[in-house]
């Protein structure tokens, strides 16, 4: 029986660093048995992944799922294109965003939900270099403030 709840498998930290995420969608993904076993072991890389809408279907590209050790002949190409499962209304919404200049579909995380593998897909706009610098400066300032507060509490 499938376990209840969610378990995070992999996150795309680079996506949140390189893009402003405007909206997220929970999607299913079409996988083969050995890919499911490999993902459950956490052997995937989504750092370079992106999604594209083609003929009213959404496909995931450049997500590397390592071959399952005991899979032998049943293993598929690690970088193959995989179909994402969404409702028609969600796909229409994605098409509307992607047709605008600068929007990209990025996989943010893979997780298990009630025994099924789900992908969190985000709609992002690329950050400029100065935006990244501002984010880093804000994080540094927050760290300094936390450090000062901890030092004052110790005294």
Swiss-Prot record:
The keyword RNA-binding applies. Gene3D superfamilies: 2.40.280.10. It is found in: Cytoplasm. Keywords: Cytoplasm, RNA-binding. Its main location: cytoplasm. One of its GO terms (biological process) is trans-translation. One of its GO terms (molecular function) is RNA binding. Disulfide bonds: none annotated. GO terms for cellular component: cytosol. It comes from the Bacteria. The keyword RNA-binding applies. Belongs to the SmpB family. Required for rescue of stalled ribosomes mediated by trans-translation. Binds to transfer-messenger RNA (tmRNA), required for stable association of tmRNA with ribosomes. tmRNA and SmpB together mimic tRNA shape, replacing the anticodon stem-loop with SmpB. tmRNA is encoded by the ssrA gene; the 2 termini fold to resemble tRNA(Ala) and it encodes a 'tag peptide', a short internal open reading frame. During trans-translation Ala-aminoacylated tmRNA acts like a tRNA, entering the A-site of stalled ribosomes, displacing the stalled mRNA. This is SsrA-binding protein.
